[in-house]
Amino acid sequence: MTGIVIVLTQEGRGTKALVQTCRLSHVRDSRETVKMKKVLLGTTAIVAAGMIASAPSAIAAEKIKLSVGGYMEQWFGYVSNDDGPGNGSAGQDYSGFDVKSDSEIHFKGSTTLDNGISVGVNVQLEANHNGGDQIDESYLIVKGGFGEINLGSENSAMYKMHYAPAEFGISINSGDQTGWLSTTRTVDANNGSSISEGGYFRAPFGSTYIEPLRANDSEKLTYYTPRIEGFQLGLSYSPDTRQDANGQPNRDAADTDLVMAGLNFNRSFGSTNVRASLGYGTVLDEVQGSGNNASAFNAGLGLAFGGLGLGISYASYDDTSANDGSGLNAGVNYSSGPWGVSLSYFHGDKDGSTTAGVVSGEGEQDTFMLSAKYALGPGITAAGTIA
């Protein structure tokens, strides 16, 4: 058998990167012929295509230069939780002052090749990961006249192309309120079980930014078309729901092969901007006998004219888990110079788990949120929220 060894060496400022890719099982060099024993590895076939980006790159028209950016949010607030009867609050007191943080450091860079194609990288470091994933997202970006390709750990087209009402304080959508308002007090009157905070984040009980099986930043391949007359389409594929995992997924042990799509419209007509979005995702390969049949849908609509903005979004999730349910978000906002104010509403329904032997609460939540912001300077904003 013949073989190929590809060695790419890229150097810059004392940093060396060495990448080797081997194919087949026999390699020749100029000094000797190495005979290798043929080994049959089951009936394994490998077909792979990839791209490697490094900073700096000696083969690029311009070297990739990574820039450092990101954001930091520091909040100080007070919460009063009602200890009403029958709410399962025994031994729990979540009222009082607290400080909460949300910060990320972003490493981004790109270069344009001689053929006009742009290749970039995006790595996001969580400064407040709360015991979770240290690297939030890490993916490769390829852009050209054909559109854009993302490869790596990142949200899907269904998530990123979704439109929801703009807010100027603590987000009522996508679960930011979870950190302040405890959901362990919300109890199903029928079976006495609590509604976990997991129902807020990336599930329609508290968010319209959703994906099937809450795939979030799992490894994905996503393609976005060019925007034509305001319309853009995005398609995503994820082998499974794991993030930062290079192990081959076991399709007999977990639901795999997720597909997600997003379609949106964004265009201005004079002084009026119109935005609309549709998204859908499902699981193609489910564990036999699971009966999960997970699917997710979301939609959004927004109008902006002058400093006034209006928006509404909806999401529904259908499967046998505790994430099953729907959510509706509506809001209005107004901005003038450095000032901005927003009023938002969210209604969430949670149908509870239908999996045999699993007890999970049903419930509803309604939240109103009034927020204001003031830009103190470039990149510095003071904000406040009452909910």
Map each language-model feature to its residues.
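N-terminal amphipathic/basic-hydrophobic helices that include classical n-h-c signal peptides
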Residues: 1-35
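Gram-negative bacterial Sec-dependent N-terminal signal peptides
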Residues: 22, 27-60
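Outer membrane beta-barrel
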Residues: 61-79, 91-242, 255-257, 265-268
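Transmembrane beta-strands of outer-membrane beta-barrel proteins
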Residues: 66-74, 115, 119-123, 149, ...
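Outer-membrane beta-barrel and related beta-rich outer-membrane complex signature
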Residues: 82-84, 161-169, 247, 288-290, ...
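Outer-membrane beta-barrel domain signature
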Residues: 90-96, 127-131, 208-214, 243-254, ...
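Detector for outer-membrane/organellar transmembrane beta-barrel domains
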Residues: 256-375
